[in-house]
């Protein structure tokens, strides 16, 4: 069973690339894991998605994050499913629909 509709995922990816940078909030589980790394110990939940890529059906849409911690810090890359996007962003409904669909498919696949 495919997790994504590749055409829909790539269409969303292209719209997100055109809209970058996009403000987002890290979900608590991801933020805790990130803060366990010394380079991100002071990272707040708010970040900026500076770039997006599609990693195929297995990886989905991934986002490169900027926490504004200064030059020389690594830029973490995370699945879009670990982020929340502001509801007033023009792509928020499309992003939320993609996230919901992907999470549902991942749960079905692991059941």
Show the residue positions of the predicted features:
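Basic/aromatic-rich interaction segments and small domains that mediate binding to polyanionic partners
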Residues: 1-14, 18-21, 28-110
